[in-house]
């Protein structure tokens, strides 16, 4: 399953947009703005709302689609621990910006802000490291397989001459 069909793209897009569409209003229901928290000036809201609410919701929706549809690929083989960890990491990297930005919006005081940032930033760094190791491992395995194929071709051509 290396290529996505039109139906696959439609499934992914539907889940992404559907979840994002639900996440935007849920942002304000689940994370109610506490009274007295500083609010941004009205002049920057047209820029702030897409960055702080819509884009994280779309990323969250894509993360949900990735988890829903990507898990079948993980189940297909006996995945390594690194493959599973990468799957979880990618899911987290895609979904975490929605709660992260909402916790920022409602955090009261520097202590709460520090806790939010330590938790989210640390887990993003860990997840990114896992994905980087996975990527390098896959590239090395492919390079090794390519070398084996070249060696086999060289042996085959040498034996025919």
Where are these regions (language model features)?
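Hydrophobic transmembrane helix segments
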Residues: 18-63, 67
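Alpha-helical membrane-anchoring segments
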Residues: 8-19, 43-50, 84-86, 112-116
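Aromatic-anchored segments of alpha-helical transmembrane domains
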Residues: 19-29, 88-100
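Loop-to-transmembrane helix junctions at the membrane interface
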Residues: 59-95
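Alpha-helical membrane-associated segments of multi-pass integral membrane proteins
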Residues: 107-149
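Cytosolic juxtamembrane helix and N-cap/initiation of the first transmembrane helix
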Residues: 1-23, 137-141, 155-156, 160
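Cytoplasmic membrane-interface segments at the C-terminal ends of transmembrane helices
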Residues: 3, 65-80, 131-150
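Interfacial non-cytosolic loop connecting adjacent transmembrane helices
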Residues: 33-51, 93-120
